[in-house]
């Protein structure tokens, strides 16, 4: 298989990303994923966290919008890195937008929905048509509604 060069490697054999937008003033980022998310064999969450997310966290990013419509499969393991990531965002949040239902089911099987908001109103099909700030405001309002 060949991956279009516009996708960036995170150090995983099967999972690639595009950082679509980051606003360091507001403290949010939009990251799109493609491929197979494999925590069981490759520990992709550790690779993602160490190589990408920790850098963003140090720069003040605390709200993560993860676009998952191109995730082909998910193989879970434990939730340690997800819990760690959740704890580190403090006043922020993690939102999984447009993840396929079967991937959400696998996330829930490993209790990752305790750390990442997903499903329901976060299935935003028209996210590509929204300006990044409008997209952030929409997701943020949906998260705030869930937390209230």
Regions found by a protein language model. Give the residues of each.
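Amphipathic alpha-helical interaction surfaces in cytosolic regulatory modules
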Residues: 56, 61-64, 68-111
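Generic structural hydrophobic/aromatic packing signal, biased to beta-strands
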Residues: 31, 52, 94-96
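STAS-typified acidic loop motif
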Residues: 2-48
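A cross-taxonomic marker for long C-terminal extensions/tails that follow the last structured domain
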Residues: 104-148
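A short, well-ordered alpha-helical element
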Residues: 40-62
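Short low-complexity stretches enriched in small and charged residues
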Residues: 17-24, 49-56, 120-128
């Amino acid at each position: 298989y060949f991956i279009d060069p516009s996708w960036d490697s995170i150090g995983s054999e099967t999972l690639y990303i595009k950082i679509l937008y980051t606003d360091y003033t507001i403290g949010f980022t939009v990251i799109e994923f493609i491929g197979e998310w494999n925590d069981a064999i490759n520990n992709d969450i550790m690779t993602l966290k160490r190589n990408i997310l920790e850098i963003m966290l140090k720069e003040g990013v605390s709200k993560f919008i993860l676009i998952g419509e191109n995730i082909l499969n998910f193989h879970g393991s434990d939730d340690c890195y997800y819990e760690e990531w959740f704890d580190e965002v403090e006043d922020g949040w993690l939102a999984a937008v447009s993840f396929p239902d079967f991937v959400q089911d696998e996330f829930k099987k490993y209790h990752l929905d305790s750390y990442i908001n997903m499903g329901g109103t976060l299935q935003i099909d028209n996210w590509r048509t929204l300006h990044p700030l409008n997209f952030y405001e929409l997701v943020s309002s949906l998260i705030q509604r869930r937390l209230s």
